[in-house]
From Swiss-Prot:
The lineage of its organism: Bacteria, Bacillati, Bacillota, Bacilli, Bacillales. Belongs to the UPF0637 family. This is UPF0637 protein SERP0693. InterPro entries: UPF0637, UPF0637_domain_sf. Pfam families: DUF1054.
Length: 203
């Protein structure tokens, strides 16, 4: 029995119609793992950074009609919330598991915080070939860094400084059938490897 990883069946929770029904499916098939990942990586981030990190599993409490198309656990050194801070995420869409670090459009002083990617631009462009950029956390669409020019990357970072809705995340994704999701051991190894890379941009 696995504790941390997700099977193709778990992703199918997003196919369930209706808000209450989908939330029930997420509670049964997805949220238990998110809570386990939350506990595991709270300790990881606290150890790695020297700050006390807190896990925030998405509640989707404001929804009254439309069922969520994704769900996640986020990590930040704030017990009350994470959206205002640069933060880490592990989450799922129907056809994608994502791991991300970056700055949401709701971020406090985001025009200053995003400069960490300017400061470490060489590290950004040196990330392995399966790392990507997300410019909107609400969409599955991500752009492989290897396929972006330096000008495009700089423009994406600058958009956070100049556009209210601008956001920037570095990301790594898996499909629901990826072999690295087959066991807790391989999945946790993949996530830790990814967060090890993301921590280069955390300060």
């Amino acid at each position: 029995m696995t504790q941390y990883t997700f099977s193709p069946k778990d992703f199918k929770a997003f196919e369930v119609e209706g808000l209450d029904q989908r939330m029930e499916a997420l509670n049964d098939y997805v949220r238990p793992q998110l809570h386990q990942l939350g506990s595991y990586f709270e300790e990881y981030f606290t150890t790695q950074t020297g700050e006390t990190f807190y896990a925030h599993v998405a509640k989707h409490a404001r929804r009254s009609v439309n069922p969520p198309i994704d769900t996640w656990v986020a990590f930040a050194p704030n017990k009350r919330g994470y959206k205002m801070l640069p933060h880490f995420q592990i989450g799922l869409f129907r056809n994608q598991l994502f791991i991300m670090f970056g700055i949401m459009h709701e971020g406090r002083n985001k025009e200053e915080k995003v400069k960490i990617f300017d400061k470490h631009f060489d590290k950004l462009t040196s990330l392995p070939s399966d790392y990507s950029v997300s410019l909107d956390h609400m969409k599955t669409e991500k752009h492989y860094i290897k396929d972006m020019s330096n000008e495009e990357l700089h423009a994406a970072i600058d958009r956070v400084k100049n556009v209210k809705k601008g956001e920037f995340f570095v990301a790594r994704t898996l499909s629901p059938t990826d072999k690295r999701l087959k066991s807790d051991k391989s999945f946790l190894k993949f996530v830790e490897e990814t967060f090890d890379e993301f921590l280069k941009f955390y300060q």
